[in-house]
């Protein structure tokens, strides 16, 4: 198990937490109230900063319940928090619904998943190896 250092920068901040054993994502909590109008976008503050282990990233992902029940999702999903970033963790939410949505203090607004990062060496080549798929993409396998 890895350790993540977390610093509260606001006295309203709640530490991220796993809701259940075996969950991949930790819930992230808002420290503010904010209304997001239909089609609107808002940066939601969490009041925390993190220090990730070497060769990891934090991915900020939507919560399925907010998406299904309120049409609220993370705009740039997954949002990437790089290992060296030391600023406040913010969550960019978008309202795809038809009604305004109110973010409450201490509301669970997103999930944070910690993932390993592989560094690769770039090799420029003239040809790539052949595969069965080749250049098939964008629905090339059909829907049934």
UniProtKB/Swiss-Prot annotation:
Residues that bind substrate: 63-65, 76, 80-82
Reactions catalysed according to its record: dUTP + H2O = dUMP + diphosphate + H(+)
Enzyme Commission no: 3.6.1.23
Cofactor(s), names only, from the UniProt record: Mg(2+)
UniProt enzyme class: hydrolase
One GO term (biological process): dUMP biosynthetic process
Pathway entry: Pyrimidine metabolism; dUMP biosynthesis; dUMP from dCTP (dUTP route): step 2/2
Pfam families: dUTPase (PF00692)
Protein task: This enzyme is involved in nucleotide metabolism: it produces dUMP, the immediate precursor of thymidine nucleotides and it decreases the intracellular concentration of dUTP so that uracil cannot be incorporated into DNA.
Designated name of the protein: Deoxyuridine 5'-triphosphate nucleotidohydrolase
Provenance organism: Alkaliphilus metalliredigens (strain QYMF)
């Amino acid at each position: 198990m890895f350790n993540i250092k977390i610093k509260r920068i606001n006295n309203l901040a709640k530490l991220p937490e796993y809701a259940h054993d075996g969950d991949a994502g930790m819930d992230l909590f808002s420290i503010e109230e904010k209304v997001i109008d239909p089609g609107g976008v808002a940066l939601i503050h969490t009041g925390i900063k993190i220090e990730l282990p070497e060769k990891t990233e934090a991915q900020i992902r939507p919560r399925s319940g907010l998406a299904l029940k309120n049409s609220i999702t993370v705009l740039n999903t997954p949002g990437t928090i790089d290992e060296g970033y030391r600023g406040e963790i913010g969550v960019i939410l978008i309202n795809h619904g038809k009604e305004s949505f109110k973010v409450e203090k201490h509301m669970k607004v997103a999930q944070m998943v910690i993932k390993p990062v592989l560094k690769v060496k770039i090799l420029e080549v003239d040809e790539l190896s052949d595969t069965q798929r080749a250049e098939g993409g964008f629905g090339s396998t059909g829907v049934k």
